[in-house]
UniProtKB/Swiss-Prot annotation:
GO CC aspect terms: cytosol
Compartments (UniProt record): Cytoplasm
Annotated TM spans: none
Protein name, as recorded: Glutamate 5-kinase
Family to which the UniProt record says this protein belongs: Belongs to the glutamate 5-kinase family.
Primary site of residence: cytoplasm
Catalytic activity: L-glutamate + ATP = L-glutamyl 5-phosphate + ADP
Length: 384
């Protein structure tokens, strides 16, 4: 569905407050007619990002466009992009151009983050990616994420950056996913062929019927259509994240977003972010082994919602690795270990044994490296 009916067909609606969000920008909004990249639509989107950062919010951009940028630097390839190796070469050539496009709009550092889905499926790499993005946001930089198309074979597929944007939104505990498209939002049918197509300004629950409405259309420069955007909304919704589809080619629409007004489609999540994360933490498979903690640490976790620090750790059982889901248990002289919580551990069992009972500032001297002050962060922990 790629028609562009008047924006007024989508009624204006308020956007609930959010603290952290992901903005996904597709190739069709960045590609220049004669090849390469154009700042035409990116400028309005940059104003949206800048206004929210100035207001104290945090944003990550997931941006396509590297392959489109690369095409302008070498002789033309067939419309399909040629062999996989050629597309990967185009991505390598164009990635620097893509980051340069975004950097020109901001007076703060823009950080390039290249990810594959393997980075986010592997628990240890997942933790590393999340820690990096959080630190970049903490430092006040603007992370710009893209698929690592140069080395990823399976990742060069339809709509991958749409899905990546949803995964990144969950990764950083975002409250909103904004997907900039070249159409106004979701319709009951393809408005290019059906003038009576009705706009859907709000979707409470995505259904197979909605996916069927979207079809599988895509632009000539990108690799995704409306269907993949709805699939991304499903992923985001399962993590408790609102998704907003809007026309990134409309200056009025983008300016409205900066004032928390949407003319487009809002897709509601299926649960709250906290409920989604806690459900996953509670039900994800647990690796063999456990961390045994003292009464003080147990009270801090149970009564104060604190993170697990090394000072309250007595010992570690088993051979778990960084990123594993492990059990946290209390131990006292008169009672056997009692399960208290479970969570994603930042250090391996061997490391936990070495730093058990020490102050967080001693982690670096003892191990020679550090993954942070906590053994299990409170965001990665759920009480039993």
């Amino acid at each position: 569905m790629t028609g562009t009916p008047p924006p007024s067909r989508f009624p204006e609606q308020p956007i609930p407050p959010w603290r952290r969000a992901v903005l996904k920008v597709g190739s069709s909004l960045l590609a220049a007619a004669g090849g390469g990249l154009s700042p035409r639509f990116a400028l309005d989107l940059a104003h949206f990002v800048s206004a929210n950062i100035t207001a104290g919010r945090q944003l990550v951009i997931v941006s396509s466009g590297a392959v489109a940028a690369g095409r302008a630097l070498i002789p033309p390839l067939p419309e399909s992009g040629g062999a996989l190796a050629a597309r990967q070469a185009l991505a390598a050539l164009g990635q620097a151009q893509l980051i340069a496009l975004w950097q020109r709009f901001f007076d703060r550092p823009v950080a390039q983050v290249l990810l594959t889905h393997d980075d986010l499926r592997n628990r240890r790499r997942y933790l590393n990616a999340r820690a990096t993005l959080r630190e970049l946001l903490h430092l006040g930089t603007l992370p710009v994420v893209n698929e690592n198309d140069t080395v990823s074979v399976d990742e060069l597929k339809l709509g991958d950056n749409d899905n990546l944007a949803a995964i990144v939104a969950a990764l950083i505990d975002a409250q909103a996913l904004f997907i900039a498209t070249d159409i106004d939002g979701l319709y009951t049918t393809d408005p290019r062929h059906h003038p009576d197509a009705q706009p859907l300004h709000e979707v409470r629950t995505l259904t197979p019927e909605h996916l069927a409405m979207a079809g599988d259309s895509s632009s000539t420069v990108g690799t995704g259509g409306m269907r993949t955007k709805l699939e991304a909304a499903l992923k985001a919704g399962a993590a408790g994240i609102d998704t907003y589809l809007f026309n990134g080619r409309s200056s009025d629409v983008v300016r409205g977003l900066a004032q928390h007004r949407l003319r487009g489609t809002r897709i509601h999540p299926t649960c709250t972010p906290i409920a989604a994360r806690k459900y996953w933490l509670r039900h994800a498979p647990v690796e063999p082994g456990a961390i045994l903690i003292d009464a003080g640490a147990a009270a801090a976790l149970a009564q104060q919602g604190a993170s697990l620090l090394p000072g309250g750790v007595l010992s570690a059982e088993g051979d778990f690795r960084r990123g594993d889901m492990i059990q946290i248990a209390t131990r006292s002289p008169d009672h056997p270990p009692h399960p208290l919580a479970r969570g994603l551990v930042q250090y391996s069992a061997a490391d936990v044994r070495r730093i058990a009972g020490c102050h967080s500032r001693d982690i670096q001297p003892l191990l020679g490296y550090t993954y942070g002050d906590t053994i299990v962060h409170r965001d990665d922990l759920v009480l039993l």
